[in-house]
């Protein structure tokens, strides 16, 4: 079967004929392997005649051996001479003596069998498991069809009317008869008629029945196939039996389950042949039914069948389910060849695009390439001798390896891969030892450190794979973060400290005020020890500007001169158009971590990735060198306790004593006392910290480390030398006894004990958070994985209105931040001069965005993913700029997965806690990760706000017991809301309020917003609420990533009135399919269907996708497959997961059809090319 040739995959029920057609023979005996000869038993579960030979090209009896007998069927033992691999694909079958039901269709929720027969699952169970009789045909008797009779009632009826006068039965045979009688078309018509007149629960039941009936009607499935006469037996190599060293056998659970079925089936056959009494046969049939149930889905009904040690056996369903199931273990993530892993160590001398690969690892990974090269160069005569040379590690092998490796990028990956920068490509450099060397600037992206982390190496094999690795994945090209477009390769720690040390200046040091004729002379003076690196000096500089040599004297320091050597001098930090600025150094300020980020950002936007990566390497080298020379180190004498600490302490203690006195006299409540004590100590801690900071010298090493952003923070310095302050107890409540000591002074026993609470809670939180955050990422990926940039422009005219996001008076996200990298949806006009700032469908860059904000425009309509008209994926115009390259997005970019990763990756940085506001009930605000999850799952939030359903004027009445808010609408009617005790009101008397606005403080239920205000309002709400959570934690995520996910949550509509369409009321359907259906009907003059947009949580939305493969590999595998099989669903394979599952190239990036037929011309390059060459920005030519 050619993998890339088919376009869709269909699933359906298997008919008995189909199962027999798949099968190579019937399994008649429960035997597996003969324990003496260790050969499979004939007609057993491992029979060679049915499933194929155990050894390649060898039949069971040994009459035919060797390849030359290929395809012959042995006349003695009946085994075909072929490869043993066929035992992975050949199936068998078991002919059942009595039909049995398939547990998925009878027991699943809702029971499909029950719905189509209009019987309750309870009644069905009684019939199937031989507890009751079912009337199949009452004939002339007063009995009803499908009536249940127990043993006693059946006897009485038989005596009363005679056994032949009506037909009743039990077990799957009876159900099968009923299913065969069903006329789907007629049933469908009847149900549709009934639907028109029914209401309430009855209507819901009819719709659910109709769904099942329509599924069968539209697919090729027949209802009676839910009952099985034949059971397929999966190939033996998929349920292996292996001998352990002790001579015992280990076997797959499936073999036990199959054996039970075969045993019971054979016993039933025998009983039927003997004509055993009805009750015994019935019991045996029930046991057969139970055995088949256990085989298909053990534990779904009743107690599961257990193996040794009371462990439930793994059935066929369990083989698909969960993390260890077929989907997630073997199809979505496979182990690959040409890979290895080792510990990482730092490689400070590497270039940005290089990594160090241990020699022995490289030899093993590149073995085939080395062998080929050895034969080509004539060092070995054939592949076999080349292999021998490599295995014996002869000397010339190393030279060949060097050559092979020189142009061959490798990919490094560190688990957990939280975003796409967790896999990057590097050019390997052979190193001694057994550790991989990693460039220090690549650590941030990988979140790696060198305390024992391990990383995996993968070798891209084909020319195409190598090209993609080099042009798209090379570390030197991945300088920006895809989530917010800021640089990810910002130097850290020592490098920052070195840069800070270089650019700081000091008064009154050796050589201050000296002047030098040029930079070289100044450097020489520094090297000879004549001047200090921080001394303010004058230097004469020369520079060619517009073909003229300009010279002049500037004031600077040696450090700044050295630092500026590695920085391009045209980044725009200095306005060169002003006279006298032409010669100034570009970086003439103190450089900390923040400023470094700005320098890299400007360099990238001005000069592109290649120059930036070269600059980064220079900054790295200088940073390490000068942080070493500076000898900045930490000692206890650097932590000076502020002299006025004692004074501040006694002040605070007096204040607290005063508060306690007031409480004891009954002036204030206990809650108030607690709040006041806490605030007193918080203020005191702040005062001590300020006193400490004022007291510190600018050149204090600890201060330098914190100020530069290399390590540590103000709060840590406060704890070292000020006071530790207030701590929280395990429940998150603040303990009112502060820790007065600092680490410099040392903690006493009680203080130490109090501070352990917080530390332990921090550790527990982190562990829980990681799992929660990972699961959130997984759901996000699943809901948005098929969003790919598929068109250039969808032609959407409707835009999405954005304005700044505020929380109270604080701007969380400014308008310009929201506009950069987007296209406009209509002209943007200056409110004062009325000139057009940006035309419709024009790209907004940073300058335009800032200008729009400056002239006072408050709201702008932009092209957004929300309003994109593409049925699959999005278009480039609606998406805008690719954050990772700062250019327009290219076709085929997997923006859905990038969005999911950008939201999920910072998840671990969010807090877990629910803030308790001093024990007041009902006002706990969920924040951090749980809040994000609550929003994306569209759950009813904790701490619900009461929302007004109408617009009008507010009137508040307060009685002794409660407050009531009345809202008078324009039409004169009043709506009242009871306000629960303890909620704070957001509205005042006489205010006007809009529909959907909050009356009390708290979070709004998004389902209320979509109901009252509509779909755009809910999109806006979700977007700004998620942004608030992330921004409060200091995490920047671009809006477009959230838009992609929220769009997936609002893609489905719920049909309310089906009009003249085929749609059923109450069903969920994709908004684009819904429009198509209506268009068809309207063209023929019919009445269109009515529907309203549904808001689905990400889990629901991921399960509601068109692709059953994607949904089944996500969650609730059996439920998804049951549903898909009945509908005879066809998977169009448009998303990424489906294609990975079946092993096709993913339809994103170069796997898109438009890129499929590109030929790659092998470039002939000089080996050991310069840096610029390896990271050159060639693009793959179309």
UniProtKB/Swiss-Prot annotation:
Q: Name one GO biological process term.
A: DNA-templated transcription
Extract the Gene3D superfamilies matched here: 1.10.132.30, 1.10.150.390, 1.10.1790.20, 1.10.40.90, 2.40.40.20, 2.40.50.100, RNA polymerase II, clamp domain (4.10.860.120), RNA polymerase Rpb1, domain 3 (1.10.274.100)
Q: Which Pfam families match?
A: RNA_pol_Rpb1_1, RNA_pol_Rpb1_2, RNA_pol_Rpb1_3, RNA_pol_Rpb1_4, RNA_pol_Rpb1_5
Query: What's a single GO CC term here?
Result: DNA-directed RNA polymerase complex
- Name the cofactor(s): Mg(2+); Zn(2+)
Q: Does the keyword Magnesium apply?
A: yes
Q: Which SMART domains match?
A: RPOLA_N (SM00663)
Query: Which InterPro entries does the UniProt entry name for this protein?
Result: DNA-dir_RpoC_beta_prime, DNA-dir_RpoC_beta_prime_bact, RNA_pol_asu, RNA_pol_N, RNA_pol_Rpb1_1, RNA_pol_Rpb1_3, RNA_pol_Rpb1_3_sf, RNA_pol_Rpb1_4
- Keywords for this entry? DNA-directed RNA polymerase, Magnesium, Metal-binding, Nucleotidyltransferase, Transcription, Transferase, Zinc
Q: How is the cofactor bound?
A: Binds 1 Mg(2+) ion per subunit.
UniProt-annotated binding residues for Mg(2+): 449, 451, 453
Binding site residues for Zn(2+) 1:
59, 61, 74, 77
Record keywords: Cell membrane included?
Answer: no
Binding locations of Zn(2+) 2:
794, 868, 875, 878
* Cystine connections: none
Domain of life from the UniProt record: Bacteria
Gene Ontology terms, MF aspect? DNA binding; DNA-directed RNA polymerase activity; magnesium ion binding; zinc ion binding
Q: State the EC number(s).
A: 2.7.7.6
Reaction catalysis annotation: RNA(n) + a ribonucleoside 5'-triphosphate = RNA(n+1) + diphosphate
Oligomeric state and interaction partners are given as: The RNAP catalytic core consists of 2 alpha, 1 beta, 1 beta' and 1 omega subunit. When a sigma factor is associated with the core the holoenzyme is formed, which can initiate transcription.
The family line of this record is: Belongs to the RNA polymerase beta' chain family.
The free-text function statement in the UniProt record for this protein reads: DNA-dependent RNA polymerase catalyzes the transcription of DNA into RNA using the four ribonucleoside triphosphates as substrates.
HAMAP family for the chain: RNApol_bact_RpoC (MF_01322)
* NCBIfam families according to UniProt: PRK14906.1, rpoC_TIGR
Q: What is this protein called?
A: DNA-directed RNA polymerase subunit beta'
Q: Which organism is it from?
A: Clostridium acetobutylicum (strain ATCC 824 / DSM 792 / JCM 1419 / IAM 19013 / LMG 5710 / NBRC 13948 / NRRL B-527 / VKM B-1787 / 2291 / W)
Q: Gene for this protein? A: rpoC
